[in-house]
């Protein structure tokens, strides 16, 4: 009887071992298939007619993805978690489009660009400026634009703003929370030992406002950054020095004179070329590259599908 039991157990163990090997082989084949599929992946073929290449960053511009590496198209289509777009992917698309005879022009869509840092946006702008040396034009449209989005949009040869739109140009600032009063009410004693004047780290614990010394060092840090931003905009829009500052400081009075028309105030200060709707923008580009019979929009290819 024991012999029979051992035979059954031996059979079961061999069966389990065989299934394990089969699963391992299947996984290996799947892995090989994935590698083969990735290596055989080809760039989306460009249509024979001329078209516009659309630069449409989603989420933050980054130098390296924070999670598992995805293609630019996967990043653009993903709705899970914060979105990111690799700067190098967009730069590569722009550089390739410069030499591509099928690409007639560039279109910038900054509507989904999140706060990324001026340095990364400037990298993208530099690639766009280089693209323009080919003689090809760059177009952009905005319903509304944040300060960072506008820095990207301003590099366009032709920038259209929606008649109901506005630009968020307010400068840059640095804020600090102070909770000395709250700590006092909670009966928390704070003891700080410091040497010198410009020691701002403990100030939130011992003050209710910003010290003169802390304000001085923050201003010294922010002024060059803001000056660099203004110079970039004024160069891109071919405006005189101080034009951005003049726009911001004159906004209250300017809007009063225009009965609150933000878009007209932006146009009056030459921060955009023209006002128009999305339909107006598409109609203009249809004249440039023709109409796609399926979408009834202009012939276009997104950078996510281009590279």
Q: What do these predicted regions represent?
A:
Residues 2-254, 286-307:
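Small-residue-centered hinge/linker elements
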Residues 149, 262-263:
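Short, hydrophobic alpha-helical packing/hinge segments within bilobed ligand-binding/sensory domains
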Residues 160-161, 272-278:
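Short acidic-hydrophobic, aromatic-tinged amphipathic segments that line or gate anion-handling sites
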Residues 256-262:
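Extended, domain-scale alpha-helical bundle/helix-rich regions
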């Amino acid at each position: 009887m024991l012999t029979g039991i051992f035979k059954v157990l031996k059979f079961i163990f061999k069966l389990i071992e065989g299934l394990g090997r089969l699963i391992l082989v299947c996984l290996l084949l799947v892995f090989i298939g994935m590698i083969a599929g990735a290596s055989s992946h080809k760039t989306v073929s460009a249509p024979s007619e001329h078209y516009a290449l659309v630069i449409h960053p989603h989420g933050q511009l980054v130098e390296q993805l924070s999670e598992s590496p995805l293609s630019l198209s996967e990043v653009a289509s993903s709705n899970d978690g914060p979105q990111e777009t690799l700067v190098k992917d967009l730069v590569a698309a722009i550089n390739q489009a410069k030499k591509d005879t099928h690409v007639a022009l560039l279109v910038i869509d900054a509507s989904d660009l999140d706060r990324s840092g001026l340095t990364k946006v400037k990298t993208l702008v530099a690639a766009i400026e280089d693209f323009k040396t080919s003689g090809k034009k760059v177009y952009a449209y905005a319903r509304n634009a944040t300060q960072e989005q506008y820095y990207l949009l301003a590099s366009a040869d032709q920038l259209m703003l929606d008649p109901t739109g506005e630009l968020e140009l307010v400068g840059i600032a640095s804020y600090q929370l102070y909770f000395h009063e709250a700590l006092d009410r909670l009966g928390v004693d704070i003891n700080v030992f410091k040497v010198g004047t410009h020691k701002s780290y403990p100030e939130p614990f011992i003050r209710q406002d910003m010290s003169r010394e802390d304000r001085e060092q923050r201003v010294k840090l922010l002024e060059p950054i803001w000056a660099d931003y203004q110079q970039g905009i004024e160069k891109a829009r071919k405006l005189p020095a101080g034009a951005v500052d003049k726009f911001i400081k004159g906004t209250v009075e300017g809007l009063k004179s225009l009965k609150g028309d933000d878009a007209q105030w932006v146009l009056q200060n030459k921060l955009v070329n023209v006002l128009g709707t999305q339909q107006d923008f598409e109609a203009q580009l249809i004249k440039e590259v023709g109409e796609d019979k399926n979408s009834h929009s202009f012939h276009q290819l997104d950078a996510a599908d281009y590279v």
